[in-house]
């Protein structure tokens, strides 16, 4: 039985990693060991940051909603506003609320009034 080598598979694997390392600076894009480490670290960061992106956007939406609510009515804050919307039966998610706060302040103002009315 003839001895086999893993040359083809190894070349494919190296090619895959070096293609992924295109655009990296210096040896990170050319040297096999350095490129492999850089690409794997990049994959770790992208996995982690896909999770973090969801949290960061939620924080951004909440910040925008809070700022818009306080601008419309000084007595309300974010948590009381969301409680008022829930009591009023308005089911709008934070992403849409933040978009309304930025693009259409009159519609957002009506939501603020409905939330305030349901609280009192």
Which residues fall in each region the model found?
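C-terminal structural segments of small proteins and small subunits
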Residues: 91-114
């Amino acid at each position: 039985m003839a001895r086999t080598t893993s040359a083809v598979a190894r070349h494919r694997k190296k090619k895959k990693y070096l293609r992924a390392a295109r655009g990296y600076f210096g040896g990170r894009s050319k040297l096999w060991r350095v490129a492999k480490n850089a690409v794997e670290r990049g994959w770790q960061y992208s996995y982690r940051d896909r999770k973090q992106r969801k949290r960061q956007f939620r924080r951004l939406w909440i910040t925008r909603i809070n700022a818009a609510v306080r601008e419309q009515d000084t007595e309300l804050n974010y948590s009381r506003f969301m409680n008022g919307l829930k009591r009023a039966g308005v089911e709008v998610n934070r992403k849409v609320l933040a978009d309304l706060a930025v693009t259409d302040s009159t519609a957002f103002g009506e939501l603020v009034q409905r939330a305030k009315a349901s609280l009192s």
